[in-house]
């Protein structure tokens, strides 16, 4: 047997279980004591707050004895005040029957609410069906009287006024008088229908009302040209329609009409003002007097020359293509036709040139006076 194996065997020492425990567990845990392990075994150990920890170490950083003796309590969250309970609720809570059957009462109240909603829906459906069947049944199905205010009445009255169709022509034939009677009967029925309460059936009926169509007038009445005076139209109403007209405080306002002569006069004035502005270049009368009207007339003749053809060839080509047949038939009418005017670009260029010449004339006059 070799000596090396004997030496190694003698060097190996048996390891005791106490030695393994001491080597595995640190020394600082062994020095803690049994209280440390008991605290870890507790399910929810109470943790000190910051105030309590400072209170314990107060002697280290506080010098005065009064502060050391004074104890600071931790701040607690504010407790919310409960709402006051009415005495009826207290009695209900105190009664043993409600405590025992509380859940059953809750379910009963929920069922009652659902039944109430179903009854309301049934009443609405019955009222809508009754309104479609007849007005008598509709009034019997209501459980509350209709309440109308002045604002709603005024709104309905204005809506009924908007449904009315006013006559557009001055004269009216006997057939038109009959049509006016029919219109007013429809208006009266619409007004009587509108004076109802705000229920769901009424709203459905309002939405389903068709707009009243104007009854076409007879073709025997000849068309008349529009007249400038409105009073003449009001005086020529048919005498048959006046007694049937319903009494209402709102006065009718006929639409404003203008005669063709008035419109043409307005257009002519606008054209004249524009032409005068371009002819006189927007100069004041004082400047025109200083320049002299004879000089202005000579320069103005350059601007207002109507014999000069327009620079816009598109409009001239269109006019020539439209009037080509008439030119071939009548040469005299072509000579009498008014020639083309000057385009806006050409006119502006001539105005600028003319103003420049006026400026040069003024400067030359100043030099001559000096």
From Swiss-Prot:
It comes from the Eukaryota. Keywords: Cytoplasm, Cytoskeleton, Phosphoprotein. It holds the Pfam family FAM110_C. The modification Phosphoserine is found at residues 238, 301. Coiled coil: none annotated. Residues 326-335 have a biased composition (Basic and acidic residues). Residues 127-151, 237-256, 317-337 are annotated as: Disordered. InterPro entries: FAM110, FAM110_C, FAM110_N. It is found in: Cytoplasm; Cytoplasm, Cytoskeleton, Microtubule organizing center, Centrosome. The keyword Transferase does not apply. One of its GO terms (cellular component) is centrosome. Belongs to the FAM110 family. This is Protein FAM110B. It comes from Pongo abelii. The lineage of its organism: Eukaryota, Metazoa, Chordata, Craniata, Vertebrata. The gene is FAM110B.
């Amino acid at each position: 047997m070799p000596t090396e194996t004997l030496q190694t065997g003698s060097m190996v020492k048996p390891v005791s279980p106490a030695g393994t425990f001491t080597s595995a567990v640190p020394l600082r845990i062994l020095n803690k004591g049994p209280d440390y392990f008991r605290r870890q075994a507790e399910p929810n150990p109470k943790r000190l707050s910051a105030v309590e920890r400072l209170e314990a170490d107060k002697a280290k950083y506080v010098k005065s004895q009064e502060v050391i003796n004074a104890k600071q309590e931790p701040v607690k969250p504010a407790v919310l005040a409960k709402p006051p309970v009415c005495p009826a609720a207290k009695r209900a809570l105190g009664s043993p029957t409600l405590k025992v059957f509380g859940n059953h009462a809750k379910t009963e109240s929920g069922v009652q609410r659902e039944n109430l909603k179903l009854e309301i829906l049934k009443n609405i459906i019955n009222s809508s069906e009754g309104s479609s069947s007849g007005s008598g049944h509709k009034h019997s199905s209501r459980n509350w009287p209709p309440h109308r205010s002045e604002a709603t009445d005024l709104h309905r009255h204005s809506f009924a006024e908007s449904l009315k169709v006013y006559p557009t022509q001055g004269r009216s034939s006997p057939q038109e008088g009959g049509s006016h009677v029919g219109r007013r009967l429809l208006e009266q029925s619409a007004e009587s229908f509108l004076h109802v309460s705000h229920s769901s059936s009424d709203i459905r009926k309002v939405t389903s009302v068709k707009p009243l169509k104007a009854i076409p007038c007879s073709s025997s009445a000849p068309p008349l040209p529009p007249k400038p005076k409105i009073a003449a139209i009001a005086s020529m109403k048919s005498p048959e329609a006046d007694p049937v007209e319903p009494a209402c405080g709102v006065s009718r306002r006929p639409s404003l009409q203008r005669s063709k002569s008035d419109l043409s006069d307005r257009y002519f004035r606008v054209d004249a003002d524009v032409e005068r502005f371009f002819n006189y270049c927007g100069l004041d009368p004082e400047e025109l007097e200083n320049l002299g009207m004879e000089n202005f007339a000579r320069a103005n003749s350059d601007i207002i020359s109507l014999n000069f053809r327009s620079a816009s060839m598109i409009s001239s080509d269109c006019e020539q293509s439209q009037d080509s047949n008439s030119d071939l038939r009548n040469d005299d009418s072509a000579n009498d036709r008014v020639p083309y005017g000057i385009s806006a670009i050409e006119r502006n260029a001539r105005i600028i040139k003319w103003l420049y010449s006026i400026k040069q004339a003024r400067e030359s006059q100043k030099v001559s006076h000096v």
